[in-house]
Amino acid sequence: MGLFDRKEKYIRINPNRYVRNGVDHPVPEVPDDLFAKCPGCKQAIYQKDLGQAKICPNCSYTFRISAKERLDLTVDEGSFQELFTGIKTENPLNFPGYMEKLAATKEKTGLDEAVVTGVATIKGQKTALAIMDSNFIMASMGTVVGEKITKLFEYAILEKLPVVIFTASGGARMQEGIMSLMQMAKISAAVKCHSNAGLLYLTVLTDPTTGGVTASFAMQGDIILAEPQTLIGFAGRRVIENTVRETLPDDFQKAEFLQEHGFVDAIVKRTELADTIATLLSFHGGVQ
């Protein structure tokens, strides 16, 4: 050290090691997913305290969950049989990077597309079932999503089954352009055929349900349920405010606001959904 060099005023330590009783130890690693920040109360919540239903113990905020987690919560154990798994996503517009994004999302989520379709029983009531997963490109609706849901309604007509759909979506998939928008009319036509057959269609709106999904099959159910505080809408809040040049209510596009104005039949806690759906299916001549 030179004559005029300053001594450091701190001690250098290795953040990955610590010494106790003269023995060097590695610092235990804390798993990244040990805690979750609640968007409702802004508190750090121990993951185990959220429970299987993923509901904040402090403010009852309902976290988003995957399609698999939804299945585990809703259907009878071992009853789910997946349908229409072999449909491949194409890139009709040759949208740059689309196929790479799909491949990365498939690897991350373990899903082939943004919706899981099949048949299952809920508390003994048999139903055709679709669950959208916002982890897959925000459950945007492309041609495969449209095809799977359409086929589900066609299957339900043949088997004389009700249809239950858990919606969650950011809207039409922009990478597929007009092909994605066409799915709105395609699914709506299938819903109408199912209705003409005298069969029940029940939707459960989960956070978020927006865009083309809201403008089509999400709001066409004979019975429309929603989870608490679900974001439901077509255009974004700022787009609407800039268009109508008015300030919207704070709870605008929330499930509670829509129920108050007649667009949602009931808001049901996640832990009560399976029982509620089963009861509604039984009222409408459920199949066992």
UniProtKB/Swiss-Prot annotation:
Q: How is the cofactor bound?
A: Binds 1 zinc ion per subunit.
Cysteine pairings via disulfide bonds: none
Task: Offer one Pfam family short name for this entry.
Answer: Carboxyl_trans
What positions does the entry give for Zn(2+) binding?
C38, C41, C56, C59
Q: Which UniProt keywords apply?
A: ATP-binding, Cytoplasm, Fatty acid biosynthesis, Fatty acid metabolism, Lipid biosynthesis, Lipid metabolism, Metal-binding, Nucleotide-binding, Transferase, Zinc, Zinc-finger
Domain (CoA carboxyltransferase N-terminal) ranges: 34-288
Write one Gene Ontology MF term: carboxyl- or carbamoyltransferase activity
Give the protein's cofactors: Zn(2+)
| EC number(s) stated in the UniProt entry for this protein | 2.1.3.15
Which catalysed reactions does the entry list for this protein?
N(6)-carboxybiotinyl-L-lysyl-[protein] + acetyl-CoA = N(6)-biotinyl-L-lysyl-[protein] + malonyl-CoA
The subcellular localization recorded is: Cytoplasm
Choose any GO biological process term that the UniProt entry carries and state it. fatty acid biosynthetic process
The answer to whether UniProt assigns keyword Lipid biosynthesis to this entry is yes
- The main location is cytoplasm
Q: Name one GO cellular component term.
A: acetyl-CoA carboxylase complex
- Give, as residue ranges, the zinc fingers classified C4-type: 38-59
Q: Which HAMAP family match?
A: AcetylCoA_CT_beta
- What is known about what this protein does? Component of the acetyl coenzyme A carboxylase (ACC) complex. Biotin carboxylase (BC) catalyzes the carboxylation of biotin on its carrier protein (BCCP) and then the CO(2) group is transferred by the transcarboxylase to acetyl-CoA to form malonyl-CoA.
Family membership, please give it: Belongs to the AccD/PCCB family.
- What's the protein here called? Acetyl-coenzyme A carboxylase carboxyl transferase subunit beta
Gene transcribed to yield this protein: accD
